[in-house]
Swiss-Prot record:
Subcellular location: Secreted
Active site: 128, 174, 213
Protein's name according to its UniProt entry: Mono-ADP-ribosyltransferase C3
Lineage, opening ranks: Viruses, Duplodnaviria, Heunggongvirae, Uroviricota, Caudoviricetes
Chain sites annotated for binding NAD(+): 80, 87, 91, 128-131, 167-169, 182-185, 211-213
Chief location of this protein within or outside the cell: secreted
Amino acid sequence: MKGIRKSILCLVLSAGVIAPVTTSIVQSPQKCYACTVDKGSYADTFTEFTNVEEAKKWGNAQYKKYGLSKPEQEAIKFYTRDASKINGPLRANQGNENGLPADILQKVKLIDQSFSKMKMPQNIILFRGDDPAYLGPEFQDKILNKDGTINKTVFEQVKAKFLKKDRTEYGYISTSLMSAQFGGRPIVTKFKVTNGSKGGYIDPISYFPGQLEVLLPRNNSYYISDMQISPNNRQIMITAMIFK
């Protein structure tokens, strides 16, 4: 099909198994932790959209199936306006609801509830852009050279810490169906999300429509299988698998 690319993924998974800059999709999660995982083999085919209209058509078709309530829609729209108002407290509490402000807790419960209706109908590739803060205080001020290129020495240190390990995001994960949304971001993650995983296309109710946004649940873990520097030396390209 025009505008859609099929990608073959071969990586290893666990056997047991961000504050935005201008919009909710660009996140810098600082309450994520990396740890070594047990590895088992995994291989499958994933759909990647390369055409905006194809992506919109697919996404809108999915959204019509959800049947979200008005309160659920409003909670998601609130999140997309400024994700830090929800993700900030969640990350600070490492995903624990205790201690959240009452108004935020109410929205968290509504968003959580919405994921009972939103699931991926097929294996799919999603993208997220991040600022250097994604790498944590150890690297965020050192990963970029003054000219905006990636510091290769620091990048090797980053790889040693995160590559071939899993990572947990305590906030919700905002992604896009297409990588073009993040051309100016220094870090771009390519997520492999499997059929049946919780997640939904929310662009029709986003405060910033047009970003082809797909929202994934909080307390999600993912395995970082690859980290590379882009050919122009201005982006770190991460490949990761979301755990169900």
